[in-house]
């Protein structure tokens, strides 16, 4: 931190100092203002779920953990980073937002007041291994893949705790680097118009498989894709039977690139060649919680409130079934000009099918209509 020029920024209720740099990637301590929406969504969620002891495992400037302490009911907030520059900056940023005296010993500084804030200088895996079954909520927001932290996070969270997991390595999850996806996520990705949803379902699926090793199941609270990152919040369920029930929600996708038609197969192993997965085929949201999140977001002072509300409202209204039809991609395949998305949705609903927009694609439609009915509808109207 010696001779480092700092500037102050505000996000939500938090004020923090960040290193002045030409780009965020040149900074010795990483802060990405584009991820403010990501942090808004978790702030909204924690206001509904009320976890008491929370960990921001990869804190950098400390912005996420500081917002947890300022904007949620959490009583004990841990901020951690392996970088010494980050550790020193986190201490300054905590004191910029809270009164009191930091007590420091061996790479750990603690501020006790209305809330307890612990600033930790260590490898995230070592901290989580040390704090076995301790945290009610753990947020993993790494630069790239979260996979090297997932095992220890599952052991560090309470057996009915909550995990928030971000993946920013879109190229593997979207099928541009399929071997990297197979190595990291143990799944075959699907390239093309469905890749954002398939990538999200691969991420949830691998969390489910890792959890099952520890006799844990999962319920998905919310999983979504936004701005080149994949995000999943899951609640852990204790017991081998819960793990077994969770694994039953895994399966595979068969996709015909010539037509845009897809088929789903539930089961731990595929029965046919050219299967994509395994992926999570269960729900991507808890409808009651997401509905509460919309109302909660309206009452909070968020950094990107308009964007947060738009995203949450769309997910709230979205049909929660696997995959969708992309009207532009199918139009190109059929060599026809398709109508506006809303017109197609109305035509499907008039025939008695469920149909909604999807946040995964501005030209996508989720519907209960079979592929043949969907094609007939877009040709007819």
From Swiss-Prot:
Enzyme class: transferase
Gene: trm1
Reaction equation(s) it catalyzes: guanosine(26) in tRNA + 2 S-adenosyl-L-methionine = N(2)-dimethylguanosine(26) in tRNA + 2 S-adenosyl-L-homocysteine + 2 H(+)
Domain Trm1 methyltransferase: 7-378
Alphabetized PROSITE patterns for the sequence: SAM_MT_TRM1
Chain sites annotated for binding S-adenosyl-L-methionine: 39, 64, 81, 123-124
One record GO biological process: tRNA N2-guanine methylation
GO-annotated molecular function: tRNA (guanine(26)-N2)-dimethyltransferase activity; tRNA binding
Disulfide bridges in this chain: none
Classification via SUPFAM superfamilies: S-adenosyl-L-methionine-dependent methyltransferases
Full protein name: tRNA (guanine(26)-N(2))-dimethyltransferase
Gene3D superfamilies according to UniProt: N2,N2-dimethylguanosine tRNA methyltransferase, C-terminal domain, Vaccinia Virus protein VP39
